[in-house]
Amino acid sequence: AVAAATFPLACPPSSTAENIAAFVAENLSAARFAEYLADPDRAVFVARDRTRILGYAMLIHARPTDPDVLAALPEGPVTELSKIYVTPDAHGGPVAAVLMRAAIDDARDRGAGTLWLGVNQQNERAQRFYRKHGFTISGTKTFRLGDTIENDYVMTR
């Protein structure tokens, strides 16, 4: 539920409800998260208070296959910060920073020399957050959202 509720917040304003729903159904369902949790190359971190989940992050400890991403990365072990989202009421608080610290630490502990992510080129709020945590733009890639192709930056640290 948190994944489906928070993903649309990162989408460009031009995104249609249908395209967002298609992405959520394909990638953020309970069944997909069960697969993610069972995958030894993934790590999922959850931030919660006493009653509910406030946010989550997911890492993929594997070299990507997308040629655009590969062109933006150095040689050697890398980890993708695939997802990091917090609920709207947690924006501006410490939750996202705590999740980011957990992601950075886990990538380092697994031997990654580089942590990378993709962020929509229009999502300036997220880009500011990533820069604050040491990420810089190192390339571009595309991202399929339903029946549209979005333009992302590849950011690395």
Predicted regions and their residues:
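Acetyl-CoA-dependent GNAT
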Residues: 1-13, 18-93, 97-106, 110, ...
